[in-house]
Every structure is written in C-alpha cells, then in structure tokens.
C-alpha cells in the first residue's frame, strides 16, 4: 500500500480543510484541553465525509459515584495545574457538537470512553 501522509499544525476549532475532506477523523485524549470542545466536535463533523468515521478515545467524569465526586472536588485545581478538565462529559459534548454516537464503551472505572461517532 502506498500512502501520502502530510502533517498540519492548526487550530482544532477552525481547521484549514474543505468540508468532507476525510474518511476518518481520529482524536485521542484531547477534548479535556479544548477551550470550546463543542466547537471542535462541530469541526470534526464538518471535515468528515458523509458516511465517514470519527474515532475518539477520551477521558471524563467517572460514572462510579465516589470517583466522579472526587474528580469534581479536585477539578479546578487539576485544570489550573495541567490545563485538563478531567470531569467533562465527553458523550454529551460530542452530541452537542452535532455528532451521532454510533458506539461507545467506558473502561477503567468509567473514566475512559472509546467512541465511534459519525457526522450527522
């Protein structure tokens, strides 16, 4: 298989690509750092072709009550120190961004989300 690969440095909220440019969009452990994750997910939807795949590995607020509450108590300090908002709800943000969740699975005490989404 011959492939041409190129790399671009860009703002995730305003990607420099035409609509429907990609068959697959992949993002890993990044939405916690986006100032406006909903806008980023809208951009993913825009650049992914109709029928394409958006594959995400994200972390967020645990669905284990005690751990989710602990994350909430320490979220501000963690975000200030590391720029990571670790108690966001990835599935809600993805849907607010206009993506359709095809399949999702939570792992590691409900913190990690493996998500297959598609553009609307």
Give the label of every model feature segment:
Residues 2, 35, 49:
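Short conserved AdoMet
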Residues 2-13:
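Conserved SAM-binding strand-loop segment of SAM-dependent methyltransferases
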Residues 8, 26, 55:
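Conserved Rossmann-like nucleotide-binding pocket used by diverse enzymes
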Residues 13-25:
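A short acidic, Gly/Pro-enriched loop at the edge of an enzyme's catalytic core
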Residues 23-36:
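A short SAM/SAH-binding and catalytic strip from SAM-dependent methyltransferases
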Residues 38-50:
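A short glycine-rich, Lys/Arg-flanked "PGG" loop and its adjoining helix->strand segment in the class I
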Residues 42, 55-114:
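C-terminal alpha-helical "lid/dimerization" subdomain adjacent to the S-adenosyl-L-methionine
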Residues 114-120:
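C-terminal lobe and adjacent flexible extensions of AdoMet/dcAdoMet transferase-like proteins
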């Amino acid at each position: 298989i011959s492939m041409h690969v190129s790399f671009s440095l860009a703002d995730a909220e305003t990607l420099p690509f035409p609509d429907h440019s990609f068959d697959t969009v992949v993002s890993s452990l990044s939405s916690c750092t986006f100032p406006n994750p909903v806008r980023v997910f809208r951009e993913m939807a825009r650049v992914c072709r109709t029928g394409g795949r958006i594959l995400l590995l994200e972390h967020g607020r645990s669905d284990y009550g005690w751990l989710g509450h602990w994350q909430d108590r320490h979220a501000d300090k963690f975000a200030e120190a590391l720029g990571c908002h670790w108690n966001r709800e990835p599935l809600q943000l993805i849907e607010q961004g206009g993506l359709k969740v095809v399949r999702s699975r939570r792992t590691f005490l409900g913190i990690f989300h493996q998500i297959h989404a598609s553009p609307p």
